[in-house]
Amino acid sequence: MYQEKTAGTKNAFTGKPNPGYATYLPIQSSLGRPLEADGLTGDFKLITQRDISHCKSRTIVDYWLLAIEPENGVIINKGDADRLGLKDGDRVKVVSATNPEGVWDFKNGVKKPMIGRVQVTQTVKPGVVTFNLGFGHWATGASDVTIDGKVVKGDPRRAAGIHLNAAMYTDPYLKNTPLQDPVGGSAVFYDSKVRLMKV
């Protein structure tokens, strides 16, 4: 199949023509370079998931759900955990090639380390780590906020757990932009690689 309309367009980053036929385009930097060519490597592929008890970021404010699952963790295959000497409940920092500090930097003087508890399972493929979305907040009532000179105290239960989007790769040339899928243009959520450091 050939699509003339697509074949007549160019990649906005590289200036190269887009293929007008079905093909696989690997995830790449904005300059069209393979991730490995820019040093974007690691030990584990990082993916995200949702759990039925906390399916959205806003569910952290639901104390009935917090009673069921008060904290998420860094989910890892048992074979990988054994190889690294990790067990359930151990704390690890998650780092990547574009976030070697393993922190969320809010650019206001506040940083939050990406440290979470290990959850060992057989439900994740070896070489992959994942985490349930909806945890690791710094807002949504998790931190103190000053309103009209009065401090509204945050609830530390809302800050529990870990959120790892900041470990996902940023484009090595654009710096402050996530890697983008060269076809769909969305952020690349499943191609970052990370390392786990026991703390």
Which residues are covered by each model-predicted region?
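Long, contiguous, secondary-structure-rich segments that constitute the structural scaffold
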Residues: 6, 62-199
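Long, low-complexity segments enriched in small/aliphatic residues
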Residues: 1-64
